[in-house]
């Protein structure tokens, strides 16, 4: 596999571990699996991940940042998610997703996004449940063992490693901003810079301050 037409180099993809799955697979994810290693780990097809990343960023670019909500409960995804929100302006929820955030207009953190982006649909099940209830599209980073019946757009990836998740968020942020004309080919932040900042974010999983308050849209 060459680097031609990839969003980043193959070496960068492999070094981040985005292709390393688990020892479990589902029929839903079979089409994204490249092979199984001798130790039983399923390996994702990097080219398919790259293709889906490109399409996800293109889809998201149809929305204003304030109309997108990106969510994660995974500790190792919090830093990358916060840096993603910082560079794009997209709203983020890190940690516990408070029930009613999308469905209860009386909730303190009630929000009305038009699309939901999940780092792990299985872990972020409360957010997924509410997105299904209100009928908004869901993009999800999915590993080899995921069931995807309620995910509108799948990004196959290792969604458990900090480096792999950081690369996913970096590439989507970069392509989202390019597609919206916010940046040109000269990207003002490199992957290394993004990764360094994401890795240095202090993770404080305090339920009282997990949701960022700037997602207070108008109530219809």
Swiss-Prot record:
Pfam families to which the protein is assigned, alphabetical: Ribosomal_S2
Q: Which GO terms describe its molecular function?
A: structural constituent of ribosome
Q: Could you confirm whether the keyword Ribosomal protein appears in this record?
A: yes
The record's comment on protein family reads: Belongs to the universal ribosomal protein uS2 family.
User: Which keywords accompany this UniProt record?
Assistant: Ribonucleoprotein, Ribosomal protein
Q: Which InterPro entries match?
A: Ribosomal_uS2 (IPR001865), Ribosomal_uS2_arc (IPR023454), Ribosomal_uS2_CS (IPR018130), Ribosomal_uS2_euk/arc (IPR005707), Ribosomal_uS2_flav_dom_sf (IPR023591)
Q: Name one GO cellular component term.
A: small ribosomal subunit
The protein's name in its UniProt record: Small ribosomal subunit protein uS2
Q: A GO term (biological process) for this protein?
A: translation
Q: Which domain of life is it from?
A: Archaea
